[in-house]
């Protein structure tokens, strides 16, 4: 079998997509029959005309999707270092390694984000896309266990951009899709964007409406993997951390002294250098709170990067789809809601001989 026939068969088999949840139709409407009697009208996907001549109804090759996601992500932090500086002093502060004395409890991020995704089917089984979005609200709660109890709650927002690729196929009545994307999340508190990698595997059946071939409902289940760059560096203003400063900073100084005085003599010798640096840093911060800031660096990680997901999509017609998905188990719980519009650019199908 030559390479052209191999590509054609592969394209004909692997046309079921998660994004459109199109299965190979067994019966055509009058409109489908009229559609197949004409030349394939769109420039994409490559090999689209061959699949069209095999009377397989492809989704519109391009789309715009609007997504809204709300969720919760649990994290863990390690290798913490702090520095105390003033904006009026251009010299960077000396960083204090506090990883030996600081212990965190739960770090939880509650997020609300919106994004737009633009995609195109390059091949009948290969989709590429770009993402741009905004985190409207991320409430982050950090509970410090030692050297003294401290609960920090902060709200951040930011923008992100990214790209992704998805491949899809069919096994009997089930579709299977593998989706991988990377996003770059920008926040004014961070020196560099946070890089997030997400991979998802989904499979499920497609239910068509006999009297309305344009419409279908797709159900799926699957798993998702999340990973991001662990090293984080940033700056936070003193007033943002302690809005009632300097009284709040004075209270933390007292907590620091209480913690140190409660150590054994051997522990006091061991942690004396760190204690004195923190004491001096907090004291300087209290005296210049309007101009002060805290420099920080740490490593963050997801303890359980895998989570389960279930979802459903209602294809109203070939152009419009509504989707919902729930992500659970692992360290992530989230709900995703989407509206998708499909379209195509008319022209000679790329690499078609006709």
Model feature map: region roles:
Residues 22-107, 130:
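Short glycine/proline- and aromatic-enriched beta-strand/turn motifs that initiate or cap beta-hairpins
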Residues 23-24, 51-62, 120-125, 170-176, ...:
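Short loop/turn motifs that connect adjacent beta-strands in outer-membrane beta-barrel proteins
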Residues 55, 66, 111, 116-124, ...:
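Residues on the lipid-exposed face of transmembrane beta-strands in outer-membrane beta-barrel proteins
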Residues 60, 110-114, 155-161, 184, ...:
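Residues that define the transmembrane beta-barrel architecture of outer-membrane proteins
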Residues 62-67, 128-130, 174-178, 199, ...:
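Transmembrane beta-strands of outer-membrane beta-barrel proteins
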Residues 68-74, 132-138, 169-173, 180-188, ...:
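Transmembrane beta-strands of outer-membrane beta-barrel pores
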Residues 76-83, 140-147, 187-194, 231-238, ...:
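Outer-membrane beta-barrel translocator domains and adjoining extracellular loop/strand segments
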Residues 183-317:
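Outer-membrane beta-barrel transmembrane domain signature
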């Amino acid at each position: 079998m030559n390479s052209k026939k191999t590509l054609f068969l592969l394209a004909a088999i692997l046309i079921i997509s998660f994004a459109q949840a199109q299965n190979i139709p067994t019966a055509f409407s009058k409109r489908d029959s009229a559609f197949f009697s004409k030349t394939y009208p769109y420039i994409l996907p490559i090999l689209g005309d061959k699949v069209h001549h095999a009377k397989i109804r492809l989704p519109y090759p391009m789309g715009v999707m609007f997504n809204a996601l709300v969720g919760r992500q649990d994290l863990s932090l390690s290798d913490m270092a702090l520095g105390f500086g003033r904006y009026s002093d251009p010299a960077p502060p000396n960083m204090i390694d506090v990883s030996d004395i600081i212990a965190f409890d739960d770090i939880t991020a509650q997020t609300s984000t919106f994004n737009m995704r633009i995609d195109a089917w390059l091949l009948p089984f290969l989709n590429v896309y770009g993402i741009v979005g905004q985190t409207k609200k991320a409430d982050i709660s950090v509970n410090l266990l030692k050297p003294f109890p401290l609960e920090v709650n902060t709200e951040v927002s930011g923008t992100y951009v990214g790209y992704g690729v998805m491949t899809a196929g069919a096994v009997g009545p089930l579709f299977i899709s593998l989706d991988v994307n990377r996003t770059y999340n920008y926040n004014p508190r961070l020196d560099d964007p946070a890089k997030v990698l997400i991979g998802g595997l989904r499979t499920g059946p497609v239910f068509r409406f006999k009297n309305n071939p344009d419409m279908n409902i797709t159900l799926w289940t699957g798993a998702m993997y999340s990973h991001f760059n662990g090293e984080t560096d940033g700056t936070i203003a003193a007033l943002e951390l302690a809005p009632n400063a300097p009284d709040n900073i004075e209270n933390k100084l007292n907590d620091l002294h209480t913690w140190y005085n409660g150590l054994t003599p051997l522990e006091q010798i061991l942690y004396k250098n760190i204690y004195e640096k923190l004491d001096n840093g907090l004291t300087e911060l209290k005296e210049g709170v309007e101009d002060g800031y805290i420099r920080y660096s740490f490593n963050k990680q997801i303890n359980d990067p895998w989570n389960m997901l279930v979802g459903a999509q209602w294809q109203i017609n070939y152009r419009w789809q509504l989707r919902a998905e729930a992500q659970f188990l692992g360290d992530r719980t989230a709900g995703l809601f989407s509206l998708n519009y499909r379209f195509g650019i008319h022209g000679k199908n790329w690499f078609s001989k006709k």
